[in-house]
């Protein structure tokens, strides 16, 4: 009842917004005849007129109807394609910072040209975000003629591009690229030493294609730039040898820490826990291998790393499966994306898991990496002034889009009525029975000349179906998502009569399956083609198209339900595009991962009680409902994980923003002389008062230790005793000022020897290098804190609040250490070392035009809300 009520509310909300948008569509339609009358030159001149109007104070919303009418007319002339009204609706939604749900085949690529053109007019840049390099290149090449006709520049940002190519791409009005590349470029830009090394401009408008995949499926995977850490490959090998001696906890043992096994597995959270028995056994083995001292515990602070290695090894063996979670190729472990089924060369699991899997598979173990910079997609895309997205499946995730990104989801109606038949699920007891039924369904479709797309959840499942088809000599294509361009070509022709295509989750996503095959792809095979040949190909295509339509269109077979209903809908959505006929059916078994882990025991008991014969399936609404409930459980759990990840990352994100902001100010400044003087004053004062109490005279001062401190840490030999002898009534305030003045004179004398220009260069480089080094260490420390913070819950403390408090304290300490390290280094540097230092860092030296001065009344960058002068002084 409540669900129906909420559905009605959201449905009404969608209809109300569409009603408003349709009024704008009418305005666009009214302008169509006016733009049809314009010549090409007059049409092209509109872009500069729009820009002038924006400079004079009009908004993007003010010029939207005219801009969209212009793009529609330009598209008719350049592509011979007219934007449908539903595509105009989609364009309006995307400009209003919404998620536009547009079904497969509704023309999302053409729709994107509308908001992309409009938002590029202000000159701040538009980033169109795709899932892979192939789609970025394809869409850029496809839409460039239209944008260039309208006077806009288009850039392409791909991995492995040179600095100059990237810089040019980002300076374009519209830039195409992948989510990974945009994110990594942002991180790299915040690691440079001069403004000239940055490639990105200020982040203005992001238009994300397949937005559900990028902002939800990949939200749990942070982007990380890392550097090599110490070599510990031998330790991974030794720990790997322990795993065969450990036995898994029996499922009936309810207590994960007790029982007859050595470890327990939580498949839902993909975690492993040692039992008391397992702990004793592991400790004994480690004693025998001399990896741990007798009498110590794995839980001792100095053995935490060993415990981490043991758990990583167990996870590698018991939770990560070859050809499902990863492949082994060319002596390397290559991750398989759990959502797309695509391999991800170059990506590595963190926290030592990747090394543990390399040890398990007996391939060369690469060194662990230390994080230099990281950000989640959630926080990266929230940096944009405006963000919008398109996908065929967003409605089931509308709450998450709204709560995390503040984006409304608008379901755009289809241009033609959807007539695909979605048959009920068939549920079998065993995997073998299910596969038999799938093969029979495929054979039936072949007899009808009906094309089939078989969707699987992993490469391993694809290969099982493929082997069964090979036994029967049935020709088919298998897409394991290794080559994006090739997979798109195969998917494009998956609508040919009788063709059988097996694909993992989202292989080929972004490419339409046209009934009868893709005519455009077929024509592009020929370089020099006669009009007679074109007619011949078109006639053949029409014949095959009609044959497929009469056979029932594209038939979708799902080999099991995915964890998310959305991914099931994506698979179904490959059929029935633009009002085409089509059908879909999911085949399930009680051995499927979803059913085994998340479905209730009631279903299992009911299936057993029915006493089904071999190869007999159950088809019942009650079972379908139970499966949906299992999916909802997983969706809710995954949402909670993503939300929690964001809550924790928000803490470090505030610190990251503060550090990057300060770092950029340092880079953009001509010199930081005034800032260095303030830091000197602050650091010296904080160190002096440790030995000179407030409101005291010299008889209460620890002069000997103070002199040692100043000499050792700051290379400062201040004549404090002489000052006291000359002026016995010196107050604490006067002596502090005198020491600071002495240090300043000392520094100025050093500057004369080294040279002012050289000193300014050294100050900036030291500041940046020290900041980067400490930030790297801070990220590692916070990561360790994050991993163990959940244990605070056992002490009746809120882990999130504890994490916020401790990470803030760590950040504050890092800032204090930064100032100390900078002052200490600059105090010690001499003229001969200064020359060597500059020679070593010549590649970092850039001069600028403006001087940076930090206001003491500005808010402190640490996020405390206090002024600089009351919190972290001059920094």
From Swiss-Prot:
Q: What is its EC number?
A: 7.4.2.8
Q: Enumerate the SMART domains for this protein.
A: SecA_DEAD, SecA_PP_bind
Q: What residues bind ATP, as annotated?
A: 87, 105-109, 512
Binding-site residues, Zn(2+): 860, 862, 871-872
What is any one GO biological process for this UniProt entry? intracellular protein transmembrane transport
For this protein, the record's InterPro entries field holds: Helicase_ATP-bd, Helicase_C-like, P-loop_NTPase, SEC_C_motif, SecA, SecA_CS, SecA_DEAD, SecA_motor_DEAD
A molecular-function term among this protein's GO annotations: metal ion binding
Induction of its expression: Repressed under conditions of excess protein secretion capacity and derepressed when protein secretion becomes limiting. This is regulated by SecM.
Q: How does it sit in the membrane?
A: Peripheral membrane protein
Write out the catalysed reaction. ATP + H2O + cellular proteinSide 1 = ADP + phosphate + cellular proteinSide 2
Co-factor binding details: May bind 1 zinc ion per subunit.
What subcellular compartments does it reside in? Cell inner membrane; Cytoplasm
Coiled-coil ranges per the record? none
User: Which is a Pfam family this sequence falls into?
Assistant: SEC-C
Which UniProt keyword terms apply here? ATP-binding, Cell inner membrane, Cell membrane, Cytoplasm, Membrane, Metal-binding, Nucleotide-binding, Protein transport, Translocase, Translocation, Transport, Zinc
For this protein, the record's Gene3D superfamilies field holds: Helical scaffold and wing domains of SecA, P-loop containing nucleotide triphosphate hydrolases, SecA, preprotein cross-linking domain
Question: Which SUPFAM superfamilies did the record assign?
Answer: Helical scaffold and wing domains of SecA (SSF81886), P-loop containing nucleoside triphosphate hydrolases (SSF52540), Pre-protein crosslinking domain of SecA (SSF81767)
GO cellular-component term (any)? cell envelope Sec protein transport complex
Cofactor section: Zn(2+)
What EC class is this?
A: translocase
Q: How does it assemble?
A: Monomer and homodimer. Part of the essential Sec protein translocation apparatus which comprises SecA, SecYEG and auxiliary proteins SecDF-YajC and YidC.
The family line of this record is:
Belongs to the SecA family.
| Its biological purpose | Part of the Sec protein translocase complex. Interacts with the SecYEG preprotein conducting channel. Has a central role in coupling the hydrolysis of ATP to the transfer of proteins into and across the cell membrane, serving both as a receptor for the preprotein-SecB complex and as an ATP-driven molecular motor driving the stepwise translocation of polypeptide chains across the membrane.
What name does the UniProt record give this protein? Answer: Protein translocase subunit SecA
Provenance organism: Buchnera aphidicola subsp. Acyrthosiphon pisum (strain 5A)
């Amino acid at each position: 009842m409540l669900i129906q009520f909420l559905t009605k509310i959201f449905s009404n909300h969608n209809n109300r917004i569409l009603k408003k948008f349709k009024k704008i569509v009418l305005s666009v339609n009214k302008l169509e005849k006016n733009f049809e009358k314009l010549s090409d030159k007059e049409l092209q001149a509109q872009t500069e007129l729009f820009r002038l109007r924006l400079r004079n104070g009009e908004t993007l919303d003010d010029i939207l109807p005219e801009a969209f009418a212009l793009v529609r007319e330009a598209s008719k002339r350049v592509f011979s394609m007219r934007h449908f009204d539903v595509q105009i609706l989609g364009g309006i939604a995307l400009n209003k910072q919404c998620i536009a749900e547009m079904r497969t085949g509704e023309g999302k690529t053409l729709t994107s040209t509308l908001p992309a053109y409009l938002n590029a007019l202000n000159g701040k840049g538009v980033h169109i975000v795709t899932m892979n390099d192939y789609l970025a290149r394809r869409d850029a090449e496809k839409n460039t003629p239209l944008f260039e006709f309208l006077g806009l520049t288009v850039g392409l940002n791909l991995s492995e591009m040179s600095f100059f190519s990237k810089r040019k791409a980002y300076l374009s009005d519209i830039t195409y690229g992948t989510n990974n590349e945009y994110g990594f470029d942002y991180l790299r830009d915040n690691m440079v030493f001069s403004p000239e090394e940055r490639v990105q401009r200020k982040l203005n408008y992001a238009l994300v294609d397949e937005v559900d995949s990028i902002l939800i499926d990949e939200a749990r995977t942070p982007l990380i730039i890392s550097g090599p850490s110490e070599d510990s490959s031998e330790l991974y090998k030794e720990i790997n040898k322990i795993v065969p001696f450990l036995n898994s906890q029996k499922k009936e043992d309810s207590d994960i820490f007790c029982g007859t096994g050595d470890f327990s597995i939580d498949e839902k959270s993909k975690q492993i826990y040692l039992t008391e028995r397992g702990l004793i056994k592991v400790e004994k083995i480690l004693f025998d291998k001399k990896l741990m001292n007798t009498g110590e515990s794995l839980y001792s602070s100095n053995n935490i790393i060993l415990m981490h290695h043991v758990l990583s090894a167990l996870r590698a063996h018991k939770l990560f499966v070859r050809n499902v979670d990863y492949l082994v190729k060319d002596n390397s472990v290559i991750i398989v994306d759990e959502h797309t089924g695509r391999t991800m060369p170059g990506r590595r699991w963190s926290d030592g898991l990747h090394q543990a899997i390399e040890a398990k598979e007996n391939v060369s173990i690469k060194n662990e990496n230390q994080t230099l910079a990281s950000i989640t997609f959630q926080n990266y895309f929230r940096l944009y002034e405006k963000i919008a997205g398109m996908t065929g499946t967003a409605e089931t995730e509308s709450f998450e889009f709204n709560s995390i990104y503040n984006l409304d989801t608008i379901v755009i109606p289809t241009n033609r009525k959807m007539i695909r038949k979605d048959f009920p699920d068939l549920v079998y007891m065993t995997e073998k029975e299910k596969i038999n039924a799938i093969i029979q369904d495929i054979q039936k479709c072949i007899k009808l000349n009906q094309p089939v797309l078989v969707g699987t959840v992993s490469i391993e499942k694809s290969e099982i179906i493929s082997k069964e088809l090979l036994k029967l000599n049935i020709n088919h294509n298998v897409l394991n998502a290794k080559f994006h361009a090739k997979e798109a070509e195969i998917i494009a022709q998956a609508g040919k009569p009788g063709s059988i295509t097996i694909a993992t989750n989202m292989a080929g996503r972004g490419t339409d399956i046209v009934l009868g095959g893709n005519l455009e792809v077929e024509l592009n095979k020929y370089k020099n083609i006669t009009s007679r040949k074109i007619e011949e190909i078109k006639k053949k295509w029409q014949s095959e198209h009609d044959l497929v339509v009469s056979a029932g269109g594209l038939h979708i077979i799902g080999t099991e339900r995915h964890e998310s209903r959305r991914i099931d809908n994506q698979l179904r959505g490959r059929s029935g595009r633009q009002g085409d006929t089509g059908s879909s059916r999911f085949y399930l078994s009680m051995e499927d991962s979803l059913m085994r882990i998340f479905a209730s025991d009631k279903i299992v008991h009911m299936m057993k009680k029915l006493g089904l014969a071999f190869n007999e399936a159950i088809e019942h609404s009650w079972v379908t409902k139970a499966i949906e409930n299992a999916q909802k459980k997983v969706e809710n759990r995954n949402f909670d994980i993503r939300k929690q990840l964001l809550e924790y990352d928000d803490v470090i994100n505030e610190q990251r923003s503060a550090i990057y902001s300060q770092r950029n100010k340092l880079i953009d400044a001509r010199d930081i002389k005034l800032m260095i003087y303030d830091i000197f004053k602050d650091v010296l004062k904080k160190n002096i008062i440790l030995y000179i109490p407030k409101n005291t005279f010299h008889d209460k001062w620890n002069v000997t230790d103070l002199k040692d401190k100043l000499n050792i840490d700051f290379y400062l030999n201040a004549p404090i005793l002489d000052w006291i002898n000359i002026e016995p009534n010196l107050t604490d305030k006067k002596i502090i000022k005198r020491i600071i003045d002495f240090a300043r004179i000392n520094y100025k004398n050093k500057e004369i020897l080294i040279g002012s220009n050289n000193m300014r260069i050294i100050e900036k480089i030291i500041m940046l290098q020290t900041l980067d080094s400490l930030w790297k260490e801070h990220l590692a420390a916070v990561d360790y804190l994050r991993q163990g913070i959940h244990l605070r819950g056992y002490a009746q403390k809120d882990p999130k609040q504890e994490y916020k408090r401790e990470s803030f304290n760590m950040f504050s300490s890092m800032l204090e250490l930064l100032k100390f390290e900078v002052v200490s280094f600059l105090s010690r540097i001499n003229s001969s070392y200064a020359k060597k230092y500059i020679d070593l860092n010549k590649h970092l030296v850039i001069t600028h035009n403006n001087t940076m001065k930090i206001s003491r009344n500005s808010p402190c960058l640490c996020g405390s809300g206090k002024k600089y002068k009351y919190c972290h002084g001059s920094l």
